[in-house]
A protein has these predicted regions:
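Sec-dependent N-terminal signal peptides
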Residues: 2-31
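N-terminal activation segment of mature serine protease catalytic domains
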Residues: 36-139, 187, 310-323
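C-terminal subregion of chymotrypsin/trypsin-like serine protease catalytic domains
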Residues: 56, 272-323
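Conserved active-site neighborhood of the chymotrypsin/trypsin-like protease fold
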Residues: 99, 126-127, 133, 144-226, ...
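Terminal peptide-recognition signature
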Residues: 119-121, 140, 147, 151, ...
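Flexible, gly/ser-rich surface segments that form the specificity/activation loops bordering the active-site cleft
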Residues: 133-135, 154-160, 200-254, 262-266, ...
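Extracytoplasmic
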Residues: 105-106, 113-120, 133-138, 144-146, ...
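Sec/Tat-exported extracytoplasmic proteins
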Residues: 68, 72, 114-118, 122-125, ...
Length: 323
């Protein structure tokens, strides 16, 4: 749901092991008790154990579609028209408490800790437009265990092109969206509510300085059928800049530029610091070309909004003055 850029993820590893065992057997004789013990079979290489962790994006997409079809059969769901109307109302909300950031962690530990708090937001597209994707996916993250979700405002507005929408956690639970609690189209942030009471929330930090290491967990599209995304992809980078920019006709706003990669399908994903706390939210990409034909890509800006744009929607407004 963000603008796209050409990118490639590839990874490979190779493992090898060799075991040479020699034994001398004397005809009609057994080996003496003092002989060296038999060689212990080597343990499986680390790569072999990791094979079980490989996941099929196709199966995840199928799971999402199946759960969404079941969700569509439920009665009393809030209509997409109403959700879009709430997003356009540009309101704020009050959140009583947010989780505290924990200790500093390495990349693998951050992924393990934060992944359960990242969600897939998506829906099935309306109509039968030629070459149109059947399913459309975006990203989001939990900030309260009772079902408060953060994503982009443009993700919510995009619901109007879908028949049914839902939010799925990494363990395959599907939830309907019951309300848009708050939204800010200028900063492209929306706060959603889903029917849940045992989700894994991510802490939200105040800020991150330029040069700080950051991570992104999102669902970028793959160069395969459109219903396949690289669900729960982890990328790493740094905060490369903090700018006041005019974007999309809005007055200057705060932009957190990062080098952690993301692409279409990553909209609404968290930008995390080394404590696993949210310091920004993915919004868009901006490719820079070296020629008028836009063929020579020189670099791609990754623009997110700082966490302050999220916190601004969660702070309670001062009470109105009494007459």
């Amino acid at each position: 749901m963000t603008s796209t850029s050409k990118w490639l993820l590839a990874g490979a590893w190779a493992t090898g092991a060799g075991v040479v065992l020699m034994a001398c057997l004397l005809a009609g004789k057994t080996a003496p008790s003092s002989a060296a013990p038999a060689a212990v079979p080597p343990k499986p290489a680390a790569g072999a154990a990791a094979e079980e962790q490989f996941q099929s994006p196709e199966e995840t997409a199928k799971k999402f579609k199946a759960e969404l079809d079941r969700l569509a059969e439920r009665k009393g769901l809030v209509s997409i028209v109403e959700l879009v109307r709430q997003a356009e109302a540009q309101k704020t909300t009050t959140i009583e408490t947010l989780p505290d950031p924990g200790q500093k962690l390495a990349g693998a530990a951050i992924y393990a800790k934060a992944r359960p708090g990242v969600v897939i937001i998506g829906g099935n597209a309306k109509g039968k437009r030629r070459r149109a994707p059947e399913m459309i996916f975006g990203s989001g993250f939990v900030i309260r265990k009772d079902g408060v979700i953060v994503t982009n405002c443009h993700v919510v507005i995009g619901f109007q092109d879908m028949k049914t929408v839902g939010v799925m956690t990494d363990d395959g639970r599907m939830f309907p969206i019951t309300a848009v609690l708050a939204a800010d189209s200028r900063n492209d942030v929306a706060i959603l509510k889903v029917e849940a009471d045992n989700l894994t929330p991510l802490p939200v930090a105040e800020s991150a300085p330029v040069g700080a290491k950051v991570y992104c967990i999102s669902h970028p599209a793959l160069n395969t059928p459109e219903t396949e995304n690289g669900f729960y992809t982890l990328t790493e980078g740094v905060v490369s800049g903090k700018f006041r920019l005019r974007l999309h006709g809005f007055p200057p706003l705060n932009v957190l530029a990062v080098t952690a990669d993301y692409a279409k399908g990553s909209s609404g994903a968290p930008i995390l610091n080394e404590h696993g706390a949210v310091v920004g939210i993915v919004c868009e990409t901006l490719p820079l070309y070296g020629d008028a034909q836009e063929q020579d890509v020189q670099m791609v800006w990754k623009f997110s909004r700082p966490s302050s744009s999220i916190l601004a929607l969660l702070r309670e407004k001062p009470p109105a003055a009494k007459p």
